[in-house]
Amino acid sequence: MTTNTVTRKVAWLRVVTLAIAAFIFNTTEFVPVGLLSDIAASFHMETAQTGIMLTIYAWVVALMSLPFMLLTSQVERRRLLICLFVLFIASHILSFMAWSFTVLVISRIGVAFAHAIFWSITASLAIRLAPAGKRAQALSLLATGTALAMVLGLPVGRIVGQYFGWRTTFLAIGVGAFLTLLCLIKLLPLLPSEHSGSLKSLPVLFRRPALMSIYLLTVVVVTAHYTAYSYIEPFVQNIAGLSANFATVLLLILGGAGIIGSVIFGKLGNNHASVLVSVAIALLMACLLLLMPASVSETHLAILSIFWGIAIMMIGLGMQVKVLALAPDATDVAMSLFSGIFNIGIGAGALVGNQVSLHWSMADIGYVGAIPAFLALVWSVIIFRRWPVVLEEQPQH
């Protein structure tokens, strides 16, 4: 915990550094979405084939989040962060040097290992390091780091890839991670493991039907989103017939709209989280259904992307808030499960998009994605009626 001897300025610097780390980790997860065509060209592959790296990355995170969290549950958190950053940086150097697609995938697995540990401990660390009475704002800052990864990280990474090659994008992320590591070493105090939970926590969490229902909702709605989002760059260029530069602009718009979603949730989420999540899922479903019809013009796609970005950010924030509220006694285990389940959804969505693109038509990714979105909408209405009080509680720390 931050003590009385720690100034509010230092406490906020620590949280901001974690938010920057969140920005970097999310940038590297999202950025291949904007680089698929370039990566495919360099290895003489089809774009849809290279998309499998998104699924592999996400499913490695999903499989390893809980085992790694349990293996490191007693490790002092500052040391753990330093070690995972070293792995993260080394893996990006390998991505830069990758001489084959297989080597690139191996390097991404290394990044995924670091990612799996990072996201299982970061939310609870931000809460511990925040100034007194500012824990909700600390979580919001982490969410902002995530949003900025979509707003700036993904499109800037794509621009760097367009002009200097996709390898340079990965190298730049590694350099950014190195600078962030130096800040973490300087700013963070010793952070003994706290409320990390253990294997004993799992049966307790699994006996919470409201929490399990939120996990199921998460995987279904994330699958819906990533079915289309994973292939938005080749969709814009190959299906809509628009320029590579517009694909970059569209990613910028979609990410920027996420900040609007974050602001809306920050204003209304305390008292109306369940309603906001259901409305956002309905909005996501509408955007997916309208993706192909909107592809007739840049203006239509840009407007659709605004609503899409708002929807997915409100969904992500809503899920995280509810998980923290439902598992205050084992935050690291609960968030590790959440990270894993979220990434199962990413991997499933990317795989569905991959199969639709290869065996059907990339033009249909929005329509196919709308199916799990509809199922998620129905499920959200059911569970928010079944556990209305429990699911409106906010995390207490």
Swiss-Prot record:
It comes from the Bacteria. HAMAP family: MFS_SotB (MF_00517). PANTHER family: PURINE EFFLUX PUMP PBUE, SUGAR EFFLUX TRANSPORTER. It is a multi-pass membrane protein. Pfam families: MFS_1. Involved in the efflux of sugars. The physiological role may be the reduction of the intracellular concentration of toxic sugars or sugar metabolites. This is Probable sugar efflux transporter. PROSITE patterns: MFS (PS50850). Belongs to the major facilitator superfamily. SotB (TC 2.A.1.2) family. GO terms for cellular component: plasma membrane. It is found in: Cell inner membrane. The keyword Transmembrane helix applies. The chain crosses the membrane at residues 15-35, 51-71, 81-101, 103-123, 136-156, 170-190, 209-229, 246-266, 273-293, 301-321, 333-353, 364-384.
